[in-house]
Amino acid sequence: PRLLILDEPSRGRGPRCLQKLADLLLRLNRDIGLTVLLAEQHLPFIRRVADRFCVLHRGRNVAEGDIMALDEPLLAQWMTPDPAP
C-alpha cells in the first residue's frame, strides 16, 4: 500500500494553497489509491480531505470515527491547555 504522512500541511498556507493541496490529496487517493495520514489541527481542511479521524491526547487515542462526527465540542474537551506546574 502507498502511504503519505503529512505533519500539519495546512500550517501557514493561504486559502488558495489549501484548496489546491486538498484537491491534490483527494485526486491521489482516488486515482492511485494513496492513503494519507495527517497530523492536523485545521478542522475545515480535515473535513475536506478526510473520511475518518483519530484524536490523540498525550499519546493516547481518545476519540475516533467517521469524519462527520468530528466537531468543535468534541475537540474542545481535548484541546484545553494543561495547567501550569
Please name every model-derived segment.
Residues 46-48:
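A short, surface-exposed alpha-helical micro-motif characterized by mixed small hydrophobic
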